[in-house]
């Protein structure tokens, strides 16, 4: 009954339950079926009566009444006349809400083309008809006729005729001998006449016959569109409109303003133009006006409809009265202000407030201070209902009055309402999920929100005027989710890396650091205390100091967990700190019996969380905070000018470096080094000096001094602050008391003259000026960075939003191999840190005993990782999101541990969004700059290799020569030195630079820190491999070589110049050859002549006739010139990698293993081919610009994947040559490199999730006997499905190769058109989806938000699962009933249906 009454009030049909949404092109019949009537007049409302005009754009007869249950003339009012149509004004009596739902239409007097299908590239109409857009526009806008039926004439079908040609043809052949038309009618006829099946077959034949790649692609594109129309049920002629739909009037309102004027939606103007022109055209046609006038009117109608659908896409933009472009239907959807992003994905919420935040140190971790005034406003409805329930008010109005007067009982009720009702606090910008957390409110006086100090790191909040917003979760479910999932106490670990994010900072750290200092020689040293009271008494009466070394009887737990006491040596302060540590076997006193820096505290919190659980951690954090604040206040640490200690040796170091710089200047003047080398050396010298001064300063500041009585004095305040991690860093201290050092120009280059002063001494005017560049550039960068970083996050979220954990285990045996990452001999990321919290892909075995440490499929916890480390395992295969075989989402095993909880990941976890946030959130900390070489980038080039381990040397691909100076020199590029420990495990491997001096040989034993090899970081040598006499080839003065006199030194050096640009130099091939005694060019051991090709900018080191030995340098290339490429760093580099762009100077990678051969050169390209080792394969050829330095010689042997030309490799090449695993490793490492430089920790799995999303498409190489088209890109899932189908039917299956798409492209090509349309290029996405008749299965998060459902992640996922189970059960019951009905003969009345609960 209730339902029926409700239906009375709700005349519109409720939204049906649907599983998917399909988009297609609307046919004229469909548009008419939506419509409630035709709009014949352009009028909107009557300006005297303000009533809508009949048949106008706001007509009440078509769209429904303006007031609820009241017709326009007022004859019928009230509910009882519901559904009656007034005979006077023809308006149906119903709810006025129907004006938001009912549509109208306009019958067009002449068909017009839909601009989206015409102009949105590629033009769908053009591709179907195989005509160019230019020709189509000529026909549509009445410039040319098109021949439809040539009849028996000489004209061709679809030939374009101008006006004169048309008339001439009519005269020549007679009027009825052929059919030609003009305008949209013509196109409509052409589209109508298409026989898609025939075209399809014809295209397939043509594709099979063609050899040209370009033609094949063109045919494939057309075939795709033909198939789209064949299979989607769309008819091509529907792309030409004969009826235009009119959207409901309440969606394009006309609002009266003060002063009798009206504000109107732009759509009304656009519709008005269409109606006016349409009516005029109808009238002209009735009047049989001349053709030219009618044609002009048709063209104007076409333009009006174009403007309505997409203003400004063709011709000039139509503007309103105030010269502002009118917003068309397409603009309503597009961009940040469009329907998708403004209203469907981003909604404003009620029950919210915002205020400034202040610190609340006395709060517990789960609390926040909420101003009373604010709470009263936010919780009003709850207060009203509670007042009513208590009988303090009878009506809402009365309750309102009570609340407004702020009566005492209202405050009591507010207390009750707020108890255990969490609120959400949010700080913009919300860069990751920790930007919104739930707290229990505590009422406070004042108007500022109080925030707990420990959650500041998660919100990235500080108290310099930041504001935060408060939201109230209303429903019980919302409160439950807030408490269980979003409470600040449930978010202790950072989702990006699994480290604690509830970490003390600043004052707290300083207080704890001060508390845990140990100083020798203080009064009372060595005393023994039995319990805390005794200790506190001694402290209070100043018998001992906090820092005194004492002994204390500590209550510990043994391995069985039984309590016992032991004597420990510690300080009084550390005992106080130990009191807050939870008692656990795993947490002995040693955990805190050391100097507590920020990092130490973080690790203690981590251990407490791992061993004692969440509740203990929260209590521990709160206590530690109170302790820290209290002791920071007690210590009273501050610093004065004298705390900045300038090292005594500063000026000595500065003077030495000055002389060094002068020497380099002199060497340059004498012509021994080039300008670039001088610059590099000077910059190098000064950065070394700065480092040294900083070291000296740190030594002096951190020095332990003793007073007269032999007790250690308190350590320097500045040092305490920096060392503890409370504030400041060694880099900042260096500027305060050391020397400021080198500064960068705005271009990123480094200025050669450093700033020698520090801030204590003060800068000179010139020094200050030099330092302003960097400071100003920093500010400009920050502004740009924020926008760029936000856009990167948005693209990442979009590409990964449908990545959800949907199952426990996909059962794959694939995985990726993990090793420690070693850079320049130091371990940057240990194996343990990379495999922690991942699932083992196979059994991990001890290399010595071969026993299994971790079983296959086991999640590796801390203890497993420790065991793997102890066993010395070098490589572990783990499961990865990249190799997960689920169709939708990822399985729990492949993902591993949920980093924010430290447990296996739950079903429904939105890992894609978490990954995107984890990568995007630190984006603002990355630099924007592209490093220009010639500065900082060279300084961190390393030029020696030292061993980090002890062991024996094993050399792979060994080729060492002794040169003329009797040094051992590396002669090949792929030589690797490995250090092996006694039991044969490889401890480290080092790739040796070509031309490096070797300090060790095969079989040598090395100690830690011993040099293995060194080389000149500033130049690359060309070495000879044979002994003989030098001769030059094609080194012609002023054509390929020039003697440059260094202007400042007058010394000549010979440099190879660009010979292509000189006259007569095009065919030269400059080289140095080594000849034997007989005057013939010597042969090399690997075949080929001893001829060394030179590249541009090589500096010769030998003369004609010089005698050389193997390993001698013939020429050198200054790295400055070999490396003029920019190193893209920071954010742009991350974006470049995720977008899978080809780097500017991309490396050329060998596709096969083989021998290098130099072919005949072209004018400005050099031809290199690789002869394969395997005779089955074909040789590969590469063309390389001549200016590029090729460091390979004829006859060198390269492996598959080696670089032929140095540079950053293009990710697509890596995928094609080395496969998915290598590509993933490359992308993960490169992206991590950028973040590591900034000290940001991100777990590899996040990057893997994004890379998985980039690898979802397959390019078809051979279509087999399937419906796929070779050369097209198709979803991996679809590819597998179609192949499975073909396999079942016994047909030949298609083959394909994986393609890597950039994140923007991948987002636009997702299976969901809703998601793609709301991301970018809305028009294009919707056009394509409509043509293909795409179905959106509503699987991702975005699509579900858009259609207003729970997202299929988190709680939404479990709800969906329950719904599925329920539907299955219902189906079973119904099937059972049907079965029963068929079995039992109808004659027997006593047969009851199955006794099952009724189905609602």
UniProtKB/Swiss-Prot annotation:
SMART domains: RPOLA_N. Its cofactor is Mg(2+); Zn(2+). The keyword Glycosyltransferase does not apply. InterPro entries: DNA-dir_RpoC_beta_prime, DNA-dir_RpoC_beta_prime_bact, RNA_pol_asu, RNA_pol_N, RNA_pol_Rpb1_1, RNA_pol_Rpb1_3, RNA_pol_Rpb1_3_sf, RNA_pol_Rpb1_4. Binds 1 Mg(2+) ion per subunit. Binds 2 Zn(2+) ions per subunit. Mg(2+) binds at residues 462, 464, 466. It catalyses: RNA(n) + a ribonucleoside 5'-triphosphate = RNA(n+1) + diphosphate. CDD domains: RNAP_beta'_C (cd02655), RNAP_beta'_N (cd01609). The keyword Nucleotidyltransferase applies. Residues 1377-1400 are annotated as: Disordered. Zn(2+) 2 binds at residues 810, 884, 891, 894. Keywords: DNA-directed RNA polymerase, Magnesium, Metal-binding, Nucleotidyltransferase, Transcription, Transferase, Zinc. Zn(2+) 1 binds at residues 71, 73, 86, 89. GO terms for molecular function: DNA binding; DNA-directed RNA polymerase activity; magnesium ion binding; zinc ion binding. It holds the Pfam family RNA_pol_Rpb1_3. GO terms for cellular component: DNA-directed RNA polymerase complex. GO terms for biological process: DNA-templated transcription. Its EC number is 2.7.7.6. HAMAP family: RNApol_bact_RpoC. Belongs to the RNA polymerase beta' chain family. DNA-dependent RNA polymerase catalyzes the transcription of DNA into RNA using the four ribonucleoside triphosphates as substrates. The RNAP catalytic core consists of 2 alpha, 1 beta, 1 beta' and 1 omega subunit. When a sigma factor is associated with the core the holoenzyme is formed, which can initiate transcription. This is DNA-directed RNA polymerase subunit beta'. The lineage of its organism: Bacteria, Pseudomonadati, Pseudomonadota, Alphaproteobacteria, Hyphomicrobiales.
């Amino acid at each position: 009954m209730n339902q029926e009454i409700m239906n009375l009030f709700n005349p519109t049909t409720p939204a049906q339950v649907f599983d998917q949404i399909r988009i297609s092109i609307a046919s004229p019949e469909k548009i008419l079926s939506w419509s409630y009537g035709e709009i014949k007049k352009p009028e909107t409302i009557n300006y005297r009566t303000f009533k809508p005009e009949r048949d106008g754009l706001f007509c009440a007869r078509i769209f429904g009444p303006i007031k609820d249950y009241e017709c326009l003339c007022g004859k019928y009012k009230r509910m009882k006349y519901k559904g009656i149509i007034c005979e006077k004004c023809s308006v149906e009596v119903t709810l006025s809400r129907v004006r938001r739902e009912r549509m109208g239409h306009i019958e067009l007097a002449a068909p017009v083309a839909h601009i989206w299908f015409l102009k949105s590239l590629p033009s769908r109409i053009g591709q179907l008809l195989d005509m160019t857009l230019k020709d189509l526009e000529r026909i549509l806008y009445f410039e040319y006729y098109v021949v439809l039926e040539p009849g028996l004439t000489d004209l061709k079908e679809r030939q374009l005729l101008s006006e004169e040609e048309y008339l001439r043809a009519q005269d020549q052949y007679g009027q009825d001998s052929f059919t030609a038309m003009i305008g949209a009618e013509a196109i409509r006829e052409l589209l109508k006449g298409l026989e898609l099946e025939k075209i399809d077959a014809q295209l397939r034949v043509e594709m099979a016959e063609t050899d040209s790649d370009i033609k094949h692609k063109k045919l494939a594109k057309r075939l795709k569109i033909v198939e789209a129309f064949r299979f989607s049920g769309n008819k091509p002629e529907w792309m030409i409109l004969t009826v235009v739909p009119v959207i409901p009037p309440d969606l394009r309102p006309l609002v009266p303003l003060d002063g009798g004027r009206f504000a109107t939606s732009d759509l009304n103007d656009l519709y008005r133009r269409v109606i006016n022109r349409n009516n005029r055209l109808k009238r002209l046609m009735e009047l049989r006006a001349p053709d030219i006038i009618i044609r002009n009117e048709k063209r104007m109608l076409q333009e009006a409809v174009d403007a309505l659908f997409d203003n400004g896409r063709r011709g000039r933009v139509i503007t309103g009265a105030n010269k502002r472009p009118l917003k068309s239907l397409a603009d309503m959807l597009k961009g940040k202000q469009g329907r998708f992003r403004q209203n469907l994905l981003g909604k404003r919420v009620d029950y919210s407030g915002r205020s400034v935040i202040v610190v609340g140190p006395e709060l517990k971790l789960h609390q926040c201070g909420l101003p009373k005034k604010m709470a009263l406003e936010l919780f009003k409805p709850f207060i009203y209902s509670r007042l009513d329930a208590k009988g303090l008010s009878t009506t809402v109005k009365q309750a309102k009055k009570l609340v407004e007067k702020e009566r005492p009982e209202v405050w009591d009720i507010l207390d009750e309402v707020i108890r255990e009702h969490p609120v959400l606090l949010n700080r913009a910008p919300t860069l990751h999920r920790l930007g919104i957390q739930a707290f229990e409110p505590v009422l406070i006086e004042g108007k500022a929100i109080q925030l707990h100090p420990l959650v500041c790191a998660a919100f990235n909040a500080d108290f310099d005027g930041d504001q935060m917003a408060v939201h109230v979760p209303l429903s019980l479910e919302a409160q439950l989710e807030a408490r269980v999932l979003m409470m600040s106490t449930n978010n202790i670990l950072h989702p990006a890396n699994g480290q604690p994010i509830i970490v003390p900072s600043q004052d707290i750290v300083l207080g704890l650091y001060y508390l845990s200092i140990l100083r020798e020689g203080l009064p009372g040293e060595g005393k023994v205390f039995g319990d805390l009271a005794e200790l506190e008494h001694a402290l209070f009466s100043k018998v001992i100091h906090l820092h005194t070394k004492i002994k204390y009887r500590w209550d510990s737990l043994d391995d069985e967990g039984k309590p016992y006491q032991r004597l420990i040596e510690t300080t009084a302060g550390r005992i106080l700190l130990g009191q807050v540590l939870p008692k656990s076997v795993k947490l002995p006193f040693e955990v805190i019996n050391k100097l507590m820096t920020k990092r130490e505290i973080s690790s203690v919190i981590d251990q407490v969380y791992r061993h004692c659980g969440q509740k203990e951690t929260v209590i521990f954090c709160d206590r530690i905070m109170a302790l820290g604040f209290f002791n920071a206040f007690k210590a009273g640490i501050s610093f004065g000018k004298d705390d900045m200690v300038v090292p005594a040796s500063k000026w000595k170091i500065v003077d030495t470096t000055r002389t060094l710089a002068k020497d380099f200047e002199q060497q340059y003047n004498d012509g021994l080094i080039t300008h670039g080398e001088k610059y590099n050396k000077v910059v190098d010298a000064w950065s070394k000096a700065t480092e040294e001064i900083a070291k000296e300063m740190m030594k002096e500041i951190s020095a332990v001094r003793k007073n007269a009585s032999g007790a250690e004095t308190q350590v320097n305040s500045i040092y305490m602050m920096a060392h503890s991690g409370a504030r400041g860093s060694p880099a900042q201290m260096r500027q305060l008391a050391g020397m400021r050092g080198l500064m960068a120009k705005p271009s990123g280059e480094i200025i050669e003259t450093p700033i020698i002063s520090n801030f204590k001494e003060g800068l000179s005017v010139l020094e200050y000026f030099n330092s302003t560049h960097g400071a100003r550039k920093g500010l400009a960068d920050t502004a740009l960075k924020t926008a760029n970083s936000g856009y990167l996050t948005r693209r990442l979220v979009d590409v990964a939003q449908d990545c959800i954990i949907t199952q426990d285990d996909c059962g794959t045996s694939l995985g990726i191999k993990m090793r420690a990452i070693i850079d320049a001999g130091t371990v940057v990321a240990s194996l343990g840190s990379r495999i922690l919290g991942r699932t083992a892909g196979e059994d991990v075995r001890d290399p010595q005993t071969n026993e299994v440490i971790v079983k296959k499929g086991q999640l590796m916890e801390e203890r497993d990782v420790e065991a793997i480390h102890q066993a010395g395992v070098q490589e572990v295969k783990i499961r990865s999101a990249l190799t997960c075989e689920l169709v939708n989402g990822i399985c729990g095993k492949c993902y591993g541990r949920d980093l924010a909880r430290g447990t296996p990941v739950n079903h429904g976890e939105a890992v894609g969004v978490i990954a995107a946030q984890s990568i995007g959130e630190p984006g603002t900390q990355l630099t924007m700059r592209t490093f220009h070489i010639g500065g900082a980038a060279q300084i961190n080039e390393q030029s020696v290799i030292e061993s980090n381990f002890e062991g024996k040397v094993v050399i792979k691909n060994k080729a060492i020569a002794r040169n003329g100076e009797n040094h051992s020199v590396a002669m090949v590029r792929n030589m690797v030195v490995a250090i092996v420990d006694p039991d044969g495990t490889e401890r480290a491997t080092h790739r040796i630079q070509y031309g490096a001096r070797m300090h060790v040989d095969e079989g040598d034993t090395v100690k830690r820190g011993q040099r293995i090899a060194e080389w000149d970081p500033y130049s690359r040598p060309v070495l000879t491999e044979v002994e003989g006499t030098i001769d030059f080839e094609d080194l012609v003065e002023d054509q390929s070589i020039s003697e440059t006199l260094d202007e400042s030194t007058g010394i000549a050096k010979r440099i190879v110049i660009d010979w292509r640009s000189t006259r007569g130099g095009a065919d030269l091939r400059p080289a140095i050859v080594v000849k034997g005694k007989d005057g013939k060019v010597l042969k090399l051991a690997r075949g080929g002549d001893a001829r060394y090709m030179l590249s541009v900018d090589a500096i010769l080191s030998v003369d004609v006739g010089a005698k050389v030995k193997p390993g001698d340098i013939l020429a050198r290339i200054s790295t400055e010139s070999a490396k003029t490429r920019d190193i893209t760093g920071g954010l742009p580099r991350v974006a470049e990698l995720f977008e899978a762009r080809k780097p500017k100077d991309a490396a050329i990678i060998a596709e096969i293993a083989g021998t290098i051969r130099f072919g005949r050169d072209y004018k400005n390209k050099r031809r290199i081919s690789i002869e394969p080792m395997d005779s089955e394969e074909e040789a590969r050829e590469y063309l390389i610009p001549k200016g590029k330095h090729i460091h390979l010689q004829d006859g060198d042997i390269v492996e598959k994947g080696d670089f032929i030309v140095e540079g950053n490799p293009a990710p697509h090449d890596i995928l094609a040559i080395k496969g998915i695993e290598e590509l993933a490793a490359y992308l993960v490492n490169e992206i991590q490199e950028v973040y590591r430089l900034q000290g940001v920790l991100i777990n590899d799995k996040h990057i893997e999730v994004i890379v998985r999303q980039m690898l979802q498409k397959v390019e078809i190489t051979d279509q087999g006997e399937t419906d796929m088209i070779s050369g097209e890109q198709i979803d991996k899932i679809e590819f597998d499905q179609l192949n499975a189908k073909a396999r079942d039917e016994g047909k030949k299956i298609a083959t394909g190769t994986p393609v890597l798409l950039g994140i923007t492209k991948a987002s636009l090509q997702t299976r969901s058109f809703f998601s793609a349309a709301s991301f970018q290029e809305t028009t294009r996405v919707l056009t394509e989806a409509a043509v293909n008749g795409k179905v959106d299965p509503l699987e991702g998060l975005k699509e579900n938000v858009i259609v207003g459902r729970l997202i299929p992640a988190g709680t939404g996922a479990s709800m969906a699962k329950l719904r599925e189970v329920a539907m299955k059960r219902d189906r079973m019951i119904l099937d059972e009933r049907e079965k029963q009905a068929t079995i039992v003969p109808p004659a027997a009345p006593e047969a009851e249906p199955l006794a099952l609960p009724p189905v609602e």
